[in-house]
Amino acid sequence: MERNRYFVWTVGCQMNVSDSERLESALQGVGYTPAEQAEDADFIVLNSCSVRANAEEKIIGKITDIQRIKRERPDTKIVLWGCMVGPNNQSIFKKKLPMVDHFVSPSAVDEVLALAPNPIYQLDEPALPVADWQVPPVNVHVPINYGCNMSCAYCVIPLRRGKERSRPMEEIAEEVRRICARGAKEITLLGQIVDSYGHDLPGRPDLADLLEYLHETPGLVRLRFLTSHPAFMSEKLLHTIARLPKVMPDINLPIQAGDDQLLKVMKRGYTVAKYTKLIERIREIIPNVSLSTDIIVGHPGETREMFERTLEMVENIRFDKVHIAAYSSRPGTKAADMELDPALAVEHGEKQYRRIALERLQERIATERNEECLGHEVEVLVEEFTKGKWRGRDRNNKLVFFEADGDWYGKVVNIHVTETRPWWLGGNLIGETLAIGA
């Protein structure tokens, strides 16, 4: 078997994907080549997620699948990386998963890289979060802060990723410059709570300052960011989004529930009225904004009446997208302790009922909102050609499909919308747009 081949398998959020892509870039920089399957690799990395139980189950299943490789080739190195690996559970995992050689905490790319046997080269410069530059990606995700200082009752992330740590502005800017110089057009800034960026840095720069700092990067066409928390969505940030043409009017602002009592139990730090007032202010400052949110159904203590108030809230605000999850218990969290009380636990069937009811409501709302685009022109950054059509995203992050001859990859085009569905738009190509920064 060819030596110095790696296999990276990733589950979880976009932060995990970005970490894995950065690791792959670094491994290639020290002389490794990617393997299409774990059986062909001598260095195997599993980047894990612990936000939901099914994500952990996927990783355990994958480890079970590859333990045969370890039996056949004992010198193969296997690394479990990511949010499953906390400061207090490594000894447990070592007993439970003896086929794994190393356990590494989230985002520690350099630590994983140091475990790769027999590197051929040394890295000349920090690796970029892109696994393959043969065809430059249109959109690249760049983490700007790690960890979380909040203490939401249901969330295990602070226990696994630790306290917030912001990257210096110049470090981020240099990375963005290098990425755009290689051909990327759109940068999405990532953070567990991205709008709390900078509070731990000298001078306390914030996300608005960072957006301003990155805005004139040569080659940069679009800037996005996710995920935000209502507590840090400042007037300064909103006015910056409205003023800077490369910053897309697209905000993900999780509310998690539409009942004040449940929000207090979740330790979210706001009421429905306060959140709704913020939404109204966002729409006042950025009239063309697209708004998405996250909602958990079946959280311990959520009654049917509380859920009905969540439906009412969604109907009133009319989000463009709602990411819906049935509550999943996470060991070590306040909510997991609550679920031990049968009076507070929500049965599986009831969770699914609530999830489906909310999905149906949001599908209707998304259908109605997208129908408002019919007959209008939208500006689309083209990301790929798939199934005979070009696909991209408009400024509001809506998927847009169109048919056209020629090569439109990475170009910004105007599309006349002739067709809508709940989750995408379709239309006819008008022509290329002279995008700012292109």
UniProtKB/Swiss-Prot annotation:
<feature type="domain" description="Radical SAM core">
    <location>
        <begin position="134"/>
        <end position="368"/>
    </location>
</feature>
<dbReference type="GO" id="GO:0051539">
    <property type="term" value="F:4 iron, 4 sulfur cluster binding"/>
</dbReference>
<dbReference type="InterPro" id="IPR007197">
    <property type="entry name" value="rSAM"/>
</dbReference>
<dbReference type="GO" id="GO:0005829">
    <property type="term" value="C:cytosol"/>
</dbReference>
<feature type="binding site">
    <location>
        <position position="152"/>
    </location>
    <ligand>
        <name>[4Fe-4S] cluster 2</name>
    </ligand>
</feature>
<keyword id="KW-0408">Iron</keyword>
<dbReference type="GO" id="GO:0035597">
    <property type="term" value="F:N6-isopentenyladenosine methylthiotransferase activity"/>
</dbReference>
<dbReference type="InterPro" id="IPR006638">
    <property type="entry name" value="Elp3/MiaA/NifB-like_rSAM"/>
</dbReference>
<dbReference type="InterPro" id="IPR013848">
    <property type="entry name" value="Methylthiotransferase_N"/>
</dbReference>
<feature type="binding site">
    <location>
        <position position="155"/>
    </location>
    <ligand>
        <name>[4Fe-4S] cluster 2</name>
    </ligand>
</feature>
<keyword id="KW-0949">S-adenosyl-L-methionine</keyword>
<dbReference type="InterPro" id="IPR005839">
    <property type="entry name" value="Methylthiotransferase"/>
</dbReference>
<dbReference type="InterPro" id="IPR038135">
    <property type="entry name" value="Methylthiotransferase_N_sf"/>
</dbReference>
<dbReference type="InterPro" id="IPR023404">
    <property type="entry name" value="rSAM_horseshoe"/>
</dbReference>
<keyword id="KW-0819">tRNA processing</keyword>
<dbReference type="Pfam" id="PF00919">
    <property type="entry name" value="UPF0004"/>
</dbReference>
<keyword id="KW-0808">Transferase</keyword>
<feature type="binding site">
    <location>
        <position position="83"/>
    </location>
    <ligand>
        <name>[4Fe-4S] cluster 1</name>
    </ligand>
</feature>
<comment type="similarity">
    <text>Belongs to the methylthiotransferase family. MiaB subfamily.</text>
</comment>
<feature type="domain" description="MTTase N-terminal">
    <location>
        <begin position="4"/>
        <end position="125"/>
    </location>
</feature>
<feature type="binding site">
    <location>
        <position position="148"/>
    </location>
    <ligand>
        <name>[4Fe-4S] cluster 2</name>
    </ligand>
</feature>
<keyword id="KW-0479">Metal-binding</keyword>
<dbReference type="InterPro" id="IPR002792">
    <property type="entry name" value="TRAM_dom"/>
</dbReference>
<dbReference type="Pfam" id="PF04055">
    <property type="entry name" value="Radical_SAM"/>
</dbReference>
<comment type="function">
    <text>Catalyzes the methylthiolation of N6-(dimethylallyl)adenosine (i(6)A), leading to the formation of 2-methylthio-N6-(dimethylallyl)adenosine (ms(2)i(6)A) at position 37 in tRNAs that read codons beginning with uridine.</text>
</comment>
<dbReference type="Pfam" id="PF01938">
    <property type="entry name" value="TRAM"/>
</dbReference>
<feature type="domain" description="TRAM">
    <location>
        <begin position="371"/>
        <end position="431"/>
    </location>
</feature>
<feature type="binding site">
    <location>
        <position position="13"/>
    </location>
    <ligand>
        <name>[4Fe-4S] cluster 1</name>
    </ligand>
</feature>
<protein>
    <recommendedName>
        <fullName>tRNA-2-methylthio-N(6)-dimethylallyladenosine synthase</fullName>
        <ecNumber>2.8.4.3</ecNumber>
    </recommendedName>
</protein>
<dbReference type="GO" id="GO:0046872">
    <property type="term" value="F:metal ion binding"/>
</dbReference>
<keyword id="KW-0963">Cytoplasm</keyword>
<dbReference type="InterPro" id="IPR020612">
    <property type="entry name" value="Methylthiotransferase_CS"/>
</dbReference>
<feature type="binding site">
    <location>
        <position position="49"/>
    </location>
    <ligand>
        <name>[4Fe-4S] cluster 1</name>
    </ligand>
</feature>
<keyword id="KW-0411">Iron-sulfur</keyword>
<comment type="subunit">
    <text>Monomer.</text>
</comment>
<dbReference type="InterPro" id="IPR000385">
    <property type="entry name" value="MoaA_NifB_PqqE_Fe-S-bd_CS"/>
</dbReference>
<keyword id="KW-0004">4Fe-4S</keyword>
